[in-house]
């Protein structure tokens, strides 16, 4: 056994140690499913496994708590598998090698899997600890959270009976989450033809770079500049007075990232060349002043190029540039339920020429309110459809609308105050969690999310703060005792 099994509370660390010895990559959860089923059988726990591989175990109430509502303890069983390049490790076969490093537990050159292994461990500990006082308990372990929320999407509708759900997949002790955003991606496809470039044109390449970028959920309220929108503004300006002809546009990559870089290749008539360059300098100066406080490293450059052979047909150019300028981007609405939380947003993620006849524009919408998510999706579709694009959407995933009046939240906050003499931070996140999908199948659920402190998740620097695990455990037990 590892040295971590001597840490307190030992019953939690012993379960975590056992979990680290079972390979559990996303989409390869067969062995951890077998581990969980064996655990249930060994401890005479009722259990059920659905078609996708999710496992739920049930423990009866302790004497005197039989009339309490059932509480679901939820965690995901898969882990992100990353290692340093100089480490020999097979995530399909090898156990995680844990070590204590000061006040932290980490792995030897790999991800630790405390996301969400420590949540699993706490749930298993509750199931076998006879000293814990609680009403009926269901422990739900989902598959493939990390790469597609597959377990939550495919959760059997007869798996759960509980009224309250405690998600154990949070990474900051002292915080209680009560909401998350749902999301949907939109892809607009412009069909185009290339035409022979006109004679007597001077061609340029404009580059926007060194923007901060960031996560399109967590960072969308920070005023980060979108590189695709910025390049489109220059093109729009040039089309008004200088007969600008577009040849190429490329910007952004990931659907869930605010784009940091973009460039375009275009031409203007030689007779307008000097005037256009002067206009560009004024335009660039205006942008630098506009972005000075929120994008201090913003860079825009214009370089003349050799003659280009082909340019975009005029109709597609008009539709593309005008829609990129006009499509909404950034924060659409703030939450009235949780002060400071973004409720609804959209991110113009990428613009790509694909093959010989398509331009593909990807936009990502988020909202903690399902109807608002649909509305912002409709806004985006309307702009691109009016511009002549074919528009399609992903299946999307639902949000978890914050309920500050939730009885479970009130009991969890009170429990935290009693235990630690301080107020927890009650928050919601403008990104996706499994909780929104649970609500879709079980709309009467009340939910909260909390956990110990993790840092460096999804990387070989992942580590779990030892001192926060007892606080996490104590809070969980107090919630179970008082709901």
Feature annotation, model-predicted:
Residues 77-79, 140-148, 170-173, 212, ...:
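Acidic, glycine-rich active-site loops and adjacent beta-strand->loop/helix elements
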Residues 219, 226-228, 232-249, 394, ...:
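Active-site-adjacent substrate-binding region
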Residues 103-106, 146-147, 152-366:
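Midchain, well-structured core segments that form catalytic/ion-binding scaffolds
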Residues 8-12, 336, 343-357, 364, ...:
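Zn-dependent metallopeptidase/amidohydrolase metal-coordination segment
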Residues 65-163, 203, 314-318, 328, ...:
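Active-site metal-coordination/substrate-binding segment of hydrolases
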Residues 3-104:
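Acidic/His- and Gly-rich active-site-bordering loop/insert found
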Residues 158, 224-241, 271-273, 318-325, ...:
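His/Asp/Glu-rich mid-to-C-terminal helical/loop segments that flank catalytic regions of hydrolases
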Residues 17-21, 263-265, 299-311, 349, ...:
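A short beta-alpha structural unit
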């Amino acid at each position: 056994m590892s040295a971590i099994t001597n840490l307190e509370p030992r019953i939690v660390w012993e379960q975590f140690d056992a979990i680290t010895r079972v390979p559990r990559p996303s989409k390869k959860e067969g062995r951890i499913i077998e581990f969980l089923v064996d655990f249930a059988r060994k401890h005479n726990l009722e259990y059920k496994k659905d078609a996708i591989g999710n496992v739920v175990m049930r423990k009866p109430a302790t004497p005197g708590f039989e009339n309490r509502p059932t509480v679901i303890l939820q965690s995901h069983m898969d882990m992100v598998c990353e290692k340093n390049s100089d480490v020999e490790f097979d995530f399909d076969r090898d156990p995680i090698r844990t070590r204590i490093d000061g006040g932290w537990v980490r792995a030897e050159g790999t991800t630790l899997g405390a996301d969400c292994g420590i949540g699993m461990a706490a749930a298993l500990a509750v199931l076998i600890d006879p000293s814990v006082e609680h009403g009926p308990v269901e422990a739900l372990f989902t598959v493939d959270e990390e790469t597609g929320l597959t377990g939550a999407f495919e959760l059997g509708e007869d798996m759960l009976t509980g009224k309250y759900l405690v998600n154990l997949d949070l990474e900051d002790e002292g915080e209680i989450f009560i909401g998350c955003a749902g999301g949907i991606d939109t892809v607009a496809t412009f069909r185009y033809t290339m035409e022979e470039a006109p004679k007597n044109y001077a061609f340029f390449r404009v580059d926007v770079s060194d923007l901060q970028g960031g996560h399109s959920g967590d960072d969308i309220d920070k005023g980060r500049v979108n590189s695709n929108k910025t390049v489109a503004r220059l093109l729009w300006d040039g089309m008004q007075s200088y007969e600008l002809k577009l040849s190429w546009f490329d910007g952004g990559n990931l659907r869930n990232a605010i784009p940091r870089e973009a460039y375009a290749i275009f031409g203007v008539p030689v007779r307008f060349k000097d005037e256009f360059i002067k206009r560009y300098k004024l335009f660039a100066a205006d942008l630098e002043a506009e972005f000075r406080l929120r994008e201090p490293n913003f860079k825009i450059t214009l370089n003349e190029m050799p003659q280009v052979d082909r340019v975009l047909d005029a109709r597609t150019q008009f539709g593309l540039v005008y829609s990129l300028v006009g499509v909404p981007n950034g924060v659409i609405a703030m939450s009235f339920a949780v002060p400071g939380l973004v409720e609804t947003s959209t991110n113009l993620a990428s613009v790509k020429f694909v093959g010989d006849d398509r331009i593909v524009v990807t936009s990502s919408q988020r909202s903690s309110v399902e109807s608002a998510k649909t509305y912002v999706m409709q806004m985006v579709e309307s702009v691109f459809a009016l511009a002549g694009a074919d528009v399609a959407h992903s299946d999307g995933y639902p949000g978890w609308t914050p309920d500050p009046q939730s009885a479970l939240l009130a009991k969890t906050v009170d429990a935290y105050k009693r235990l630690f003499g301080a107020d927890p931070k009650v928050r919601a996140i403008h990104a996706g969690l499994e909780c929104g999908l649970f609500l879709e199948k079980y709309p009467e659920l009340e939910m909260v999310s909390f956990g110990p402190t993790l840092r460096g998740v999804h990387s070989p620097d992942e580590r779990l703060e030892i001192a926060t695990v007892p606080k996490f455990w104590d809070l969980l037990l107090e919630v179970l005792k008082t709901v």
